[in-house]
Amino acid sequence: ILEILRVNDPEISVVDYDENDIMFGKHGKLHVLPYVKRDMLMLENQIPMKVLHILTKVETGADEEDDYELNTKIIKLLNPIFMEDTSSNEKIKESGKCMHVLDLYRKSLILEEPSYPPPPPTPQKGKENCLCLEAGEIDQIIRSAIELQEAGIRFKKSKTRSLKDFSFNRGVLWLPALKLDDGTEYMFLNLIAFERIHVGAGNEITSFIFLMDTIIDSAMDVPILSRSGILINALGNDKVVAKLFNSMSKEIPVERGGHLDIVRNNMNRYCKKPWKNWRASLIHTYFRNPWAIVSLVAAIFLFALTIIQTIYTVRQFYQNPNPSPSPTKSPSFPVTPRRRP
């Protein structure tokens, strides 16, 4: 692991390996490294960070453990987008001690502070704060992206890439941008397993996946999020994306009283407004099918023509209420002059 981190560090310009090396050459970086990254994030492959620190001390001869340097190398390899932030160095220092590589990678996904203000805790009276939501109740929790759009809710990309930066405000659902590729499923499944096994680790990743599963119910929901810049689909097929989120959140419990619960309640209150339901019903009935739209426009056009014709007829009647009959003229016959004998 340490050699992989060293060779793939962009700040190291000289690498003492042959270009054709199957592991550390150009071929390895292109064809082998993606699978190495995936294996580094598997829960059963985790090595305690303490072991990596000891090996680093033996290699460099340092007397003290340098969490920042080792954490930086790991994040550069596994989450390079995080390093594009100008304040990434300070955020890496805030990560502190980590149990292993997967723990550090998880922190890099949620280290950025969300753009929404932290809501005050709202304990529910008469209910336990640890009451869990079952994935089977999904239809009763949050509607799909199509249904939310019909109710007037818009989707926008959050200002940060933190997976805990999702919120709902004034009819807009803010979600962090997410790139989907062949390694996405392995990554999230291991992160969810880590949060469920380790007490006190948090449930930020689980809450995000649970939310995305509620929004993405079928392949028709995926283009809505893609057009908003929320989903970057490298899988190619919308059906595969929908199946991915629907399978990852099966039988996942999420604690009540967290940020996900607040977003859910705000969205439900917004969708329960009467005129929102009328708008959703109108769009669902008349604007789903293009032929239905054409029929509706034609009906409105004919109705408008009928009203105009009625107004014109009534107006003519009131302008000439008692029209005077025109005088009749007696028929005239031609007179032929008489001839004198």
Model-based region annotation:
Residues 1-287, 314, 319-341:
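Acidic, Ser/Thr- and Pro/Gly-rich low-complexity regulatory segments
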Residues 279-317:
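Alpha-helical transmembrane segments and their immediate juxtamembrane boundary regions
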